[in-house]
Amino acid sequence: MPLLNSLATPYADALLQVTDVRQESEEVANQCKDLLSAWESSEPLRDAMTSPVLEPEAKKKALTSLLSEQVTPSLMNLLKVLADRQRLPALEAVLLRYLELYRESRNIALAHVRAAQPLTEEQQAALTTKVQSMAGTNAVEIDLKVDPSLIGGFVVNLGSQVIDASLSGQVRRLGLALAKAS
């Protein structure tokens, strides 16, 4: 990942500088999330855009027809530059790095939350408040995923901190305690 990160950082940093000047950083961050979601869920899209067989012009034409109405000109220009330079295989890393740089520049903490079932709005608000106090910032972004294997409860990852309030985690800890006792 360090090599991919060193490739992604200049592109992501340039995009952040441009979007800051144009005051569209938040909009582009949301578009990056949407694009990442589409990229991760569409294997045919990934295969086509990373194929060494397709010419850069064909990739740019496809990207323009697919995304020109959904993304800002700044993000569209980045996609075209990546296509021209045969860097579309690094698109995911570039978008993720942009989001990291965006959060860092605005002091936004990212918490990855796995819950056994979807959280109610009230639970999400309480969780957001707790994560804000843990992070020491009022700006938090919560990446919430449902994971039924937790049986009940949730797990929060905030940087290097982990809070495991899941039933499966409690069962695992109980098993470890019993193994130590015997």
UniProtKB/Swiss-Prot annotation:
A molecular function (GO) term: proton-transporting ATP synthase activity, rotational mechanism
Source organism, top-level taxon: Bacteria
Main location (coarse class): membrane
Location of the protein in the cell: Cellular thylakoid membrane
Keyword annotations: ATP synthesis, CF(1), Hydrogen ion transport, Ion transport, Membrane, Thylakoid, Transport
Pfam families linked to this entry: OSCP (PF00213)
Topological relation to the membrane, as annotated: Peripheral membrane protein
Assigned GO CC terms: plasma membrane-derived thylakoid membrane; proton-transporting ATP synthase complex
InterPro entries assigned: ATP_synth_OSCP/delta_N_sf, ATPase_OSCP/d_CS, ATPase_OSCP/dsu
Task performed by this protein: F(1)F(0) ATP synthase produces ATP from ADP in the presence of a proton or sodium gradient. F-type ATPases consist of two structural domains, F(1) containing the extramembraneous catalytic core and F(0) containing the membrane proton channel, linked together by a central stalk and a peripheral stalk. During catalysis, ATP synthesis in the catalytic domain of F(1) is coupled via a rotary mechanism of the central stalk subunits to proton translocation.
Similarity-based family: Belongs to the ATPase delta chain family.
HAMAP family: ATP_synth_delta_bact
Quaternary assembly: F-type ATPases have 2 components, F(1) - the catalytic core - and F(0) - the membrane proton channel. F(1) has five subunits: alpha(3), beta(3), gamma(1), delta(1), epsilon(1). CF(0) has four main subunits: a(1), b(1), b'(1) and c(10-14). The alpha and beta chains form an alternating ring which encloses part of the gamma chain. F(1) is attached to F(0) by a central stalk formed by the gamma and epsilon chains, while a peripheral stalk is formed by the delta, b and b' chains.
Name under which the protein is recorded: ATP synthase subunit delta
Source organism: Synechococcus sp. (strain CC9311)
